[in-house]
């Protein structure tokens, strides 16, 4: 059995809000849908999922999780920045996940990369600034992040 590819994620906090990617995903069959698989959705059909994630993605060969977080942040949002520190570790769809606070953020967030190209009626992406209440409403995923992000927002930690 091969090791699961880790995920690096960028935590960008500004003015009491965190940048998230709101998503709607629907596949034809639940067997084709990663959210059905990890959400234990029964049945043959995928009815669709509305949720939000932090900008991030898989760690490429020879890349660190921090490097992946910065690369994915730029690819998905056009923002650049620097890693301030590792905030948390966890899992995302059954693979290791590393969450980094990003500082010295430059630019205006704009949906880009695959998230902009793959926009469709069954695969929709939207960048949003979320406060603590929004995290629940948007369905932050993985759900364990909500508590961590809420504490970070309430502490006013935006890494400058």
Model-derived segments and their meaning:
Residues 137-160:
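Charged phosphate-binding loop/patch that engages nucleotide di/tri-phosphates or the phosphate backbone
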Residues 1-53, 81, 85:
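N-terminal strand-loop-strand
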Residues 57-82, 88-143:
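Unchanged
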Residues 8-9, 14, 60, 64-67, ...:
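Residue-level detector of intrinsically disordered, flexible termini
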Residues 33-35, 73, 96, 144, ...:
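A generic membrane alpha-helix/interface feature
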